[in-house]
Swiss-Prot record:
Fe cation 2 binds at E63, E108, Q142. One of its GO terms (molecular function) is identical protein binding. PROSITE patterns: FERRITIN_1 (PS00540), FERRITIN_2 (PS00204), FERRITIN_LIKE (PS50905). The keyword Acetylation applies. One of its GO terms (cellular component) is mitochondrion. This is Ferritin heavy chain. It is an enzyme of class 1 (oxidoreductase). PANTHER family: FERRITIN, FERRITIN HEAVY CHAIN. Oligomer of 24 subunits. There are two types of subunits: L (light) chain and H (heavy) chain. The major chain can be light or heavy, depending on the species and tissue type. The functional molecule forms a roughly spherical shell with a diameter of 12 nm and contains a central cavity into which the insoluble mineral iron core is deposited. Interacts with NCOA4; NCOA4 promotes targeting of the iron-binding ferritin complex to autolysosomes following starvation or iron depletion. GO terms for biological process: immune response; intracellular iron ion homeostasis; iron ion transport; negative regulation of cell population proliferation; negative regulation of ferroptosis. The modification N-acetylmethionine is found at M1. Stores iron in a soluble, non-toxic, readily available form. Important for iron homeostasis. Has ferroxidase activity. Iron is taken up in the ferrous form and deposited as ferric hydroxides after oxidation. Also plays a role in delivery of iron to cells. Mediates iron uptake in capsule cells of the developing kidney. Degraded to release iron upon autophagy activation by nutrient starvation.
Amino acid sequence: MTTASPSQVRQNYHQDAEAAINRQINLELYASYVYLSMSCYFDRDDVALKNFAKYFLHQSHEEREHAEKLMKLQNQRGGRIFLQDIKKPDRDDWESGLNAMECALHLEKSVNQSLLELHKLATDKNDPHLCDFIETYYLSEQVKSIKELGDHVTNLRKMGAPEAGMAEYLFDKHTLGHGDES
């Protein structure tokens, strides 16, 4: 591996922040990969919950966009992007919509915690630009995602999922499908 040439635009950008951004990029890509796995699982012919598949595919795209936004920031600040291997999802069989939503909730909380730690690092290193970036583009969105997933988990449980097979079908159709006829 060759060493990156020094940046002429770098200013008030600590090496620890640069390294943390690279770790966050990896975590966002991992989240995208997990959501893609979930989407493909629900699209299988023996699962056939198309709106769960669409929902998780949308989440996958969103997480990839988060990673790309961080990459753009890294370049704007004069940092260097060092991509690492993306860890494989912990499972291939997501078992049920409820289980997948619970895993997604846990994942979003992990991503949020990592962002909070990145924000603390930026604060400690006196980097107001990075603090503003995280606050503007990530923190509110994370809280909304966590709330939405928590609501989905609650509603699936109230409906009797996963024991009541009809519950996930109805949730797929009326909540994730917004009542679509198909």
